[in-house]
Every structure is written in structure tokens, then in C-alpha cells.
């Protein structure tokens, strides 16, 4: 959203998933279930929309079990690029202390059979400069994903790679080349069974996909073949300017969801709404609930959602769904929980 806001696998499974994916692996062919859950924010705190960094505040793992008990099976885990690599964009290693905190979240999620989205929350930027467009090189971006794909997965199929949070104000054709470099790096690192979220422009807004602004990104290819593992990343907020910064909702966005669903079917693609949310108001209890129900009904074109946000957010934050003393707030109980898988 537009504010400041990894692995032991059974060796048999890892070996099976690392095998060539020519079409005879049942795990490779399996479809994702209907997904629903939350963003656990904090490891991204201090990152602004220009990719400048501040001070992270990674949450503990206790909320993972809490939300799984509620019915969640998807956790998006935002992290700042600078924090992951010790503020060195060309680093050949991950920052050990920070990554240990982040990896604990990933492990907590996948150990319970849920899905973890690894989200680099930098708005396609590093300290104000755009990836591949005057800022970090595509190789720097690819190196980051090589490190993450190597460290995070052990080829665990419950990891989903969210390449970049909310790119904006950039050349989309050039950005498609940066995205392709990251996809290639992930696959070359041996992470061949995981899904990858392709981030669109305009803060990953839904309209940019079906209105054609993101057409260049449809040309991104997967070295393992096909496009079934390349999911489209979508964000949608229902406040007056769709920014996710206001307490009141003014639409349920079902018209946008219908257009997206039709477009996805027409193009043979699938998407995840990795950010949406609402304020602690009656309008958002209604509109967010209707929107999430619409996502549920649009499965499998739209595979699911992750609501913004819990984790290290104080319960008083305008879009908070952080539980208080283990108790969910009213927005979560009314709008989110009934639409979880």
C-alpha cells in the first residue's frame, strides 16, 4: 500500500520438486486452492513509496497460528530490500540477523501448510531510483531474487514469490525486462515449482491490467514453460481515491472485479489480490465484505486475497486487522473471516 509502511523441507520432497518439470510431476501440475488471508507487515516498515528505507519492526510468529485458526491459508510477508541485504544493493549475501527474523515468519507459515508470499516492498525502487531505469541494475534485482530463491525455498511449493510491491511511475516496457530478469534468476536458482506474482504498474492496481497499461508484462515468460505459474499481482482498495488511506469505503469494487475476471479468462491468466482492506467503519464492513465475497466467487480466475494488514501495526491504524489480546476486530469478524477458505 502507499504508505511507509525461508527452510527445512523433507529431502524426498525437495528432490522430487527439483526434478525437471516437463509435465510429469503431479506437484508441479497441482492447482492452487482458494486462498485467503492477511498481510503480516513490519519487516517492511520505514520503506516509503520512493524506496527509501527507515527502521523495520518485524512481527513475531504468534499471529500466524491465530489467523490459521480463523481459517486463513495465505500470508503475505512484506520486507524491505535494504533490510534484506544490509543496505548494499549489490550484496552477494542476505543480512543474517534480519533474515533470521523474516525467515521465522516464512517457516511458521509453511510449517502449518499455509502459503507464504515473499514480498519485496520497495515500489520498484532503491532510495528513490527505479530498477533498470537509472537505479539498481536488472542484475542487482536478479541477484536479490537468486539469494531469496536459494535461501527461502528448498523448493517448497507453498512459497510464492511476490517480485515487487506496487511499482509506479515508470516505463512499463523497460520494467517488463526487469521482471523477466527476476523470473529467470528464481528458476535458475532451482526454484522451479513455485508460483511467481508479476507486479503491474500504477501501484499494481487492478484497472491497469484489464485496461491495457500492463500489456508489456504479459510477455514475461517462464523458463519452466507456460504461464500457469506466473500469476498477476493485483491491489484494490475501496476508499474514495482507491489508495487505502481513508477510513470510509465508497464502493465494493464489484464492477472492477467483474472486468478483471472477464479479462483474466479471456487471456488465460490468473491473479491474486495481494492487498485490499478497509477502515473500522460500517461502510467498509459492508463494501470490503462484498468485495472479498466477489473474489471468492471468481475463483479460480482470481485465486484469493490477502488483507492489509496485521503484524506489527497497532490496532488503532486505520486499516489494522491486528488482533488485540488474541481477539479479532469487528472489521475482520464481519468482512474478512466469513470469506476465508
From Swiss-Prot:
Any GO molecular function: cellulase activity
Keywords: Carbohydrate metabolism, Cellulose degradation, Cleavage on pair of basic residues, Glycosidase, Hydrolase, Polysaccharide degradation, Signal
Prodomain residues: 17-30
Biological process (GO), any one: cellulose catabolic process
Domain of life assignment: Eukaryota
UniProt EC number: 3.2.1.4
Keyword Cytoplasm: no
Signal peptide as annotated in the record: 1-16
Catalytic reaction list: Endohydrolysis of (1->4)-beta-D-glucosidic linkages in cellulose, lichenin and cereal beta-D-glucans
Keyword check for Acetylation: no
Residues at the active site: 166, 275
Family: Belongs to the glycosyl hydrolase 5 (cellulase A) family.
Protein function: Has endoglucanase activity on carboxymethyl-cellulose (CMC).
Protein name: Endoglucanase 1
Organism: Saitozyma flava
